[in-house]
Structure formats: C-alpha cells, structure tokens
C-alpha cells in the first residue's frame, strides 16, 4: 500500500482525511510543534504526527499540502530536496518569483515533481491547453459572501458590514492578489500559472451580501478561440473561506497517486 504525508490538519485536511482512498495509507501529518499533541488526539494511533519533515522515518509515495502559504514556505523545498512528489493547494505562495524558482530548481535537481492542484476552480486543463496554442488574455473573477472575505485584506478596502449590493472591491494582477489575499486567492494564482502568468492575469474580486456560495469565473481569449468557465461552489461547513471543491481536488489528487488510470 502506498503511503501519504499530509502537511496541515485544519478544516480542509480533516475533510481529506475522512475521504482518502482505501489503498492509500496516511502515515505522517506535519503540523506546527504547538499542534502536535492536539492532532494526535484526532487521528488513528498509527499515524505519526510530526513538526518537521526531517522527523519522517520513511519515504512517502506522495505528499499533499493543505496548510497555507506559511507551511509551503517552511516545508515544500525540503520535501522536494528529499526527492518526494508534492501536491500544493496553497498555490498563491508561488507569487513569490524567487521562491518559485527555488522550488523549480530543487525539484529538477532531485527528480521530484511539484503538482499544482486545481483547487476551487474547474477548467485548468483547458487554460493550460490553450497556452500551448496562443493564449492571449485571461481574467479571473471571484465573488464571495461578506463572511468569506472577513479577516482578509478586503476589510481594508471595503466595509463588509455596509455592503447592500454586489460590489467589486479589488482589481489587479494575479501576483498582487495572491500576496494580498493569501487565504482567498489561490485560485487566481493557479489560473495564472496555467495560463498567461502572474503579471498578465487580471483578477477582479467581488462581495455579494445575498449569497452563501463562492462564484469563480474565468474568461480567456486567444488563437484557440474564447472560453468562459463559471463555477458556483459551496464552502466547507467548518470554514467559510474554504471551498468544498478545493478539498475534493486534494482527494482526487490522492486517488490519482494510486490509480493506474488517472483523470
């Protein structure tokens, strides 16, 4: 049976843990030192809960990150240096161009692969394919409820308690969006890296006081033609800032790591 390492154990990780493929064994969970004991109480005894990659006593077949940008900065390079493949959900971390280059070089030098998971959006395969044939323009539009934007940079741009209609409060590049909205803009970073890049992808962020769902729209143009992809998703009940589909994309990546036929 193949073995999995999971970095993080918050709301999304708990969802993934509950729905892992039967033929993939979760062997290691990596969390901050302060959280080790509490996480141990939530998982099976055979799972090793550690705070440092170097404490791992084996070699995972696959590593997934579901912990946020700080955890990517702390652990991803070390994972790749061990020659282990890793799937990232916190793709916004790669808005840091120097860090992106470090990870790319480390992966190449150690024969490892860095997988950027689609997360909360559909159509990443189409964007990546269009890039091969002349993708020229990509705009990402994200719309969420006021509660989904609370605790983010949005509160510095708009009074979320005084929003009475659909309101766009941010327009900029994917690089800037990923840096300013680390918990909300991983989708923008994924779209950008699949397509025309961090500095050429336009991001528009909107708040809707009458919704409880997350709406993602991609509009792309190029020599291939035009495409519009719209996704209306439901947040996790345990965390309104996290898309259910994002958690499911991690589960799908785990399944792909063990299946002979991958989609």
UniProtKB/Swiss-Prot annotation:
GO annotation (BP), single: NAD biosynthetic process
Keyword NADP recorded: yes
Pathway named in the protein's UniProt entry: Cofactor biosynthesis; NAD(+) biosynthesis; iminoaspartate from L-aspartate (dehydrogenase route): step 1/1
Catalytic machinery residues: 216
Enzyme Commission number(s) of this protein: 1.4.1.21
InterPro entries on file: Asp/hSer_DH_NAD-bd, Asp_DH, Asp_DH_prok, L-Asp_DH, NAD(P)-bd_dom_sf
NADP as UniProt keyword: yes
GO molecular function list: aspartate dehydrogenase activity; NAD binding; NADP binding; oxidoreductase activity, acting on the CH-NH2 group of donors, NAD or NADP as acceptor
Alphabetically ordered keywords of this record: NAD, NADP, Oxidoreductase, Pyridine nucleotide biosynthesis
Binding site for NAD(+): 120, 186
Other facts noted in the record for this chain: The iminoaspartate product is unstable in aqueous solution and can decompose to oxaloacetate and ammonia.
Family: Belongs to the L-aspartate dehydrogenase family.
Name of the featured protein: L-aspartate dehydrogenase
Lineage of the species this protein comes from: Bacteria, Pseudomonadati, Pseudomonadota, Gammaproteobacteria, Moraxellales
Gene: nadX
């Amino acid at each position: 049976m193949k073995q999995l390492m999971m970095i993080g154990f918050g709301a999304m990780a708990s969802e993934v843990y509950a729905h892992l493929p039967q033929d993939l064994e979760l062997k290691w969970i990596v969390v901050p030192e302060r959280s080790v004991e509490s996480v141990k109480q939530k998982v099976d005894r055979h799972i090793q809960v550690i705070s440092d990659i170097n404490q791992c006593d084996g070699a995972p077949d696959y590593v997934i990150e579901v912990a946020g940008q700080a955890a990517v900065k702390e652990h991803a390079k070390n994972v790749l240096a061990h020659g282990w493949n890793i799937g990232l959900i916190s793709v916004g971390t790669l808005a840091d161009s120097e860090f992106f280059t470090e990870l790319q070089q480390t992966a190449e030098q150690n024969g490892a692969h860095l997988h950027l998971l689609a997360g909360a959006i559909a159509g990443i395969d189409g964007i990546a394919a269009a890039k091969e044939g002349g993708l020229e323009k990509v705009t990402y539009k994200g719309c969420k409820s006021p509660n989904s934007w609370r605790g983010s940079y949005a509160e510095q741009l708009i009074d979320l308690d005084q929003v009475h209609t659909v309101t766009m409060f941010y327009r900029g590049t994917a690089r800037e969006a990923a840096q300013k909205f680390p918990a909300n803009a991983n989708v923008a970073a994924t779209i950008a890296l699949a397509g025309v890049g961090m500095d050429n992808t336009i991001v528009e962020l909107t708040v809707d006081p009458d919704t409880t769902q997350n709406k993602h729209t991609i509009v792309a143009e190029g020599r291939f033609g035009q495409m519009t992809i719209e996704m209306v998703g439901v947040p996790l009940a345990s965390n309104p800032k996290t898309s259910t589909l994002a958690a499911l994309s991690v589960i799908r990546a785990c399944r792909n790591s063990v299946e002979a036929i991958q989609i």
